[in-house]
């Protein structure tokens, strides 16, 4: 069913093809566009289907030839009435127009000329003009070009004073509708032709200084003045008519087909603008339909681009071109994220602004399975997104080609394009500031990151700190604005496994930053290095730096400087650690001028910094560099802290672990000369000669010391505890047990200077052999064993041992590395196992019966299941945790239970950790600490 739409606001220069182009993609049948004109610039469009009409109504508010149009629903009846009304208005206006030379001397026009009845006379003369008349009128026109009554040769035998009526386009437009009835009306009397001699008196007009022979005189005073002889003389403005624009001048040309006596009908509506119902001369129409008569406006480059949002991630360039089917797409650029995947946005470039305008009408339409948004874009966005501009011949509004725009060079000198830009600090330049560069980044990596962009030679600057390592900052300068904008679009893209931040910066700002970095390097002079030299001349061993942890993630340099108020610190010496995403790690590094200032900072340990207790640890310059190079998630992972009282022992690696320094002699069976006990004494005392199976020694420590039984694969934080192969012979004893005389040294507190717990009073040799079998619990362990004295042997088979000592596999290969062997077997200054520099502590959980407290175990509960050993060490950072003692618990299925065991060097240290850190979070869960 055909639907009619009424269009208002149509400009004068628009034609039917412009309307059809406005409704491109919709079905308009042939002859379905009717332009009425009028004051509102109206037109009627007939659509073939309701759907086309509905889609057409959605385009209301659009522009045709720069004029905004409004669409209204209409009907065929209204359309026909408006067309008929327009025709009548044209006819009435044409017949009421007075002749242009009505005020000239001569016989007045006949009163019948204002009526339609005199038209047949003139129309009949159109088809059979007299050659003499045509020649005469033409010659008159040649001599009087300013007189519009002789502006056409098609007047026939009509009097000259009627030329204005016949020569106007409005009059000619009524000929097709009036010629048919005119032939039936008898011609009225016509004024005689001899009235023509009334024209010669015109040259005698006194106000005109032109000599009389010149025929180009202006009209008489009542007629408005005419400009001096143009190529096509314009008509005198006519009285205003309702809704009619100014008329075009009459053509001056030979008679067209249809007027030369051939009798062929004249089709005035053929390829003409219907707003005027056909111009006067079909050969030279009013050239409004031809774009060649209208000078094309310069095209704004921004009018060629649109931005598309919300596309499916799987959309390709062909999908975008299919979406804009029917439009001339020049190029498509799909935007991508930092990984290189489509992000659902894109930019499209068209060949003409009309295509862009039509593309904007497809906003909120379906592409594949998603409704996309189409919005205007600019050439700057296109260039910034990485699109290329090719200055080829651009298409004008109607398809004409225009030469490319003239691009002026930056410099008038011949080499201006080849040399780099001036390095004046006052010049803005095209510079970028890079942050987050890998520490091993070089110029070639930066060039590869900005590949295909024109970088100024030797303009890449990578900043280095006082330690000689890259700080992650850099600067790059580009040659032109397009490459500069393209570089800014690579913000947060990856270089290797780190994403780079690209920020704009002026050349002056870049030079200031580079100068600041160089001054920082100069301040780190050799004099300052000498200040922190220790007596041995080691630069890195002096503790002139502080590592501040457990601070808010949003901490800033100013907060740290306020926290260190009273201690002289340079602002450039404070470094807040951030991760790869630029987020704070809750840590800061401070480098002081001397060790005294660093010691002063230790007084701030556990002081409040923005609501949190800050942990301040003094570290060496080497440690600070290590922390700065590999910033941990929290604290410094793997930072080895010196443990008081646990020095490295020659021949015993890993600070107290039994090693190759343990002799193979002195075992039962080989005799114990140092104790004076025969080798058979141990067997007679109740020790099994075939060894002690692991099941024979109960684990009195229970689950609390179960970490001693886990394998090194599960602990994964310490070396396996293996006795030397020659220690136990051919596995004759399995896990070796120290001789009875050494019991106090082996199972009591074996620290240097601590006497044994034997009854004889001799250090290390006070245990009687008979008392070993049935003594009054004189070998019972300390209270830390499991809540009370234990029998260390009331007969064969009941020999007790330290908790967990015998629960491991033979050789104690899985025990933590801090569990030492008998002290008498290691080197020492004296012959006995008494005081000496060897520190072989007992297993964690051992408490001493006297003197310094021994290692203590803490049970950590309610941790996240994904927690790692490093995170636990970070949690206890600052406390003296025994290296390699952290053990995660797993259930029978191998799944984590959220619990762990941690051993500390002393009970005081463990107690402080429980008091300070209980109910503190690890991740999103608050952990519980239970003292062993």
From Swiss-Prot:
Q: Domain of life of the organism in this record?
A: Eukaryota
Database matches in SUPFAM superfamilies: RNA-binding domain, RBD
Does the keyword section mention Transit peptide? no
Query: What biological process terms from GO does the record include?
Result: regulation of RNA splicing
Q: Which residues carry this modification: Phosphoserine?
A: 352, 375, 420, 422, 424, 525
An example of a GO molecular function for this protein is: RNA binding
- SMART domains per record: RRM
- Which InterPro entries is this protein grouped with? ESRP, Nucleotide-bd_a/b_plait_sf, RBD_domain_sf, RBM12_RRM1, RBM12_RRM2, RBM12_RRM3, RBM12_RRM4, RBM12_RRM5
What are the record keywords, sorted?
Disease variant, Nucleus, Phosphoprotein, Repeat, RNA-binding, Schizophrenia
CDD domains linked to this entry = RRM1_RBM12, RRM2_RBM12, RRM3_RBM12, RRM4_RBM12, RRM5_RBM12
Annotated localization: Nucleus
Q: Where is the RRM domain?
A: 304-379, 430-507, 856-932
Compositional bias of kind Low complexity? 98-116, 717-734
Compositionally biased spans, kind Pro residues: 824-836
- Keyword Hydrolase appears in the UniProt entry: no
Matching Pfam families, A to Z? RRM_1
Here the segments flagged for biased composition (Gly residues) are: 783-811
List compositional bias (Polar residues) regions by residue number. 392-401, 408-417
* PROSITE patterns listed in its UniProt record: RRM
Q: Which disease is it linked to?
A: Schizophrenia 19: A complex, multifactorial psychotic disorder or group of disorders characterized by disturbances in the form and content of thought (e.g. delusions, hallucinations), in mood (e.g. inappropriate affect), in sense of self and relationship to the external world (e.g. loss of ego boundaries, withdrawal), and in behavior (e.g bizarre or apparently purposeless behavior). Although it affects emotions, it is distinguished from mood disorders in which such disturbances are primary.
Q: What is this protein called?
A: RNA-binding protein 12
């Amino acid at each position: 069913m055909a639907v009619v739409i009424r269009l208002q606001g149509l400009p004068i220069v628009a034609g039917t093809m412009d309307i059809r182009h406005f409704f491109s993609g919709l079905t308009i049948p042939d002859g379905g566009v009717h332009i009425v004109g009028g004051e509102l610039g109206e037109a009627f469009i007939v659509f073939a289907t309701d759907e086309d009409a509905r889609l057409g109504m959605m385009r209301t508010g659009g522009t045709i030839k720069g004029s905004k149009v409004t669409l209204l629903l209409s009907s065929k009846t209204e359309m026909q009435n408006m067309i008929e009304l327009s025709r009548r208005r044209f006819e009435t206006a044409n017949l009421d127009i007075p002749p242009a030379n009505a005020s000239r001397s001569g016989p007045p026009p006949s009163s019948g000329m204002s009526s339609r009845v005199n038209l047949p006379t003139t129309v009949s003369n159109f088809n059979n003009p007299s050659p003499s008349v045509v020649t005469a009128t033409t010659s008159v026109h040649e001599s009087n070009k300013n007189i519009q009554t002789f502006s056409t040769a098609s007047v026939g035998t009509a009097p000259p004073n009627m030329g204005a009526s016949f020569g106007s386009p409005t009059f000619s437009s009524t000929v097709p509708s009036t010629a048919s009835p005119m032939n039936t009306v008898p011609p009225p009397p016509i004024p005689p032709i001899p009235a023509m001699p009334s024209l010669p008196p015109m040259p005698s007009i006194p106000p005109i200084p032109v000599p009389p022979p010149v025929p180009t005189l202006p009209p008489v005073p009542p007629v408005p003045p005419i400009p001096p002889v143009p190529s096509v003389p314009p008509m005198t403005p006519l009285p205003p008519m309702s809704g009619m624009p100014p008329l075009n001048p009459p053509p001056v040309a030979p008679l067209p087909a249809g007027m030369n006596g051939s009798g062929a009908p004249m089709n005035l509506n053929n390829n003409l603008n219907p707003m005027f119902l056909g111009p006067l001369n079909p050969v030279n129409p009013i050239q409004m339909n031809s774009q060649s008569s209208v000078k094309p406006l310069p095209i704004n480059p921004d009018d060629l681009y649109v931005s598309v949002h919300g596309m499916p991630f799987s959309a390709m360039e062909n999908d975008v071109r299919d979406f804009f089917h029917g439009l001339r797409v020049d190029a498509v650029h799909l935007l991508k994220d930092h990984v290189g995947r489509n992000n659902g946005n894109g930019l499209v470039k068209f060949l003409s602004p009309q295509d862009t305008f039509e593309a904007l009408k497809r906003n909120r339409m379906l592409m594949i399975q998603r409704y996309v948004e189409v919005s205007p874009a600019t050439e700057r966005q296109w260039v910034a997104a990485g699109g290329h501009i090719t200055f080829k011949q651009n298409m004008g509004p109607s398809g004409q080609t225009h030469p490319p725009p003239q691009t002026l060079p930056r410099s008038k000198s011949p080499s201006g394009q080849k040399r780099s830009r001036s390095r004046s600090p006052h010049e803005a330049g095209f510079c970028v500031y890079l942050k987050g560069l890998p520490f091993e980044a070089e110029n070639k990596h930066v060039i590869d990151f900005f590949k295909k962009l024109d970088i100024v030679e030797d303009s890449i600057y990578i900043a280095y700190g006082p330690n000689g390592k890259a700080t992650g900052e850099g600067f790059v300068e580009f040659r032109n604005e397009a490459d500069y904008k393209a570089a800014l679009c690579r913000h947060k893209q990856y270089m290797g496994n780190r994403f780079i931040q690209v920020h704009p910066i002026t050349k002056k700002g870049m030079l200031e930053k580079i100068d600041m970095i160089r001054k920082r390097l100069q301040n780190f002079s050799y004099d300052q290095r000498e200040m922190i030299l220790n007596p041995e001349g080691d630069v890195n061993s002096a503790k002139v730096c502080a590592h501040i942890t457990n601070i808010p993630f949003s901490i800033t340099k100013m907060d740290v400087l306020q926290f260190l108020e009273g201690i002289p610190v340079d602002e450039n010496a404070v470094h807040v650690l951030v991760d790869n995403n630029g987020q704070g790690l809750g840590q800061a590094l401070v480098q002081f001028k001397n060790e005294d200032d660093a010691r002063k900072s230790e007084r701030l340990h556990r002081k409040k910094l923005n609501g949190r207790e800050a942990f301040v640890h003094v570290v060496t310059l080497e440690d600070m560099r290590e922390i700065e190079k590999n910033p941990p998630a929290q604290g410094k992972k793997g930072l080895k802290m010196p443990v008081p009282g646990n020095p490295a022992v020659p021949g015993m690696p890993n600070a107290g672990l039994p090693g190759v320094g343990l002799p193979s002699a002195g075992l039962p069976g080989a005799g114990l000369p140092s104790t004076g006990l025969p080798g058979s004494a141990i067997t007679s005392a109740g020790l099994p000669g075939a060894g002690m199976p692991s099941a024979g020694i109960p684990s009195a420590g229970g689950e609390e010391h179960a970490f001693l039984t886990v394998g090194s694969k599960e602990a994964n934080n310490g070396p396996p505890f293996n006795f030397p192969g020659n220690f136990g012979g051919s596995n004759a004893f399995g896990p070796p047990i120290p001789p009875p005389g050494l019991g106090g040294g082996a199972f009591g507190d074996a620290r240097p200077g601590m006497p044994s717990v034997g009854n004889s009073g001799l250090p290390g040799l006070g245990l009687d052999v008979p008392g070993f079998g049935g003594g009054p619990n004189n070998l019972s362990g300390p209270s830390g064993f499991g809540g009370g004295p234990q029998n260390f042997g009331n007969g064969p088979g009941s020999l007790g041992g330290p908790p967990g000592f015998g629960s491991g596999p033979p050789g104690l290969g899985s025990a933590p590395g801090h569990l030492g062997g008998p002290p008498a077997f290691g080197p020492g200054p004296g012959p006995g196992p008494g005081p000496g520099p060897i520190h072989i502590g007992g297993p964690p959980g051992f408490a001493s019966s006297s003197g310094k407290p021994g290692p203590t175990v803490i049970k950590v509960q309610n941790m996240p299941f994904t927690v790692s050993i490093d995170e636990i060490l970070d949690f206890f950072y600052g406390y003296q945790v025994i290296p390699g003692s952290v053990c995660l618990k797993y259930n029978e299925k191998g799944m984590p239970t959220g619990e762990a065991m941690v051993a500390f060097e002393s009970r005081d240290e463990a107690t402080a950790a429980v008091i300070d850190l209980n109910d503190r979070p690890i991740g999103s869960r608050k952990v519980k600490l239970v003292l062993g």
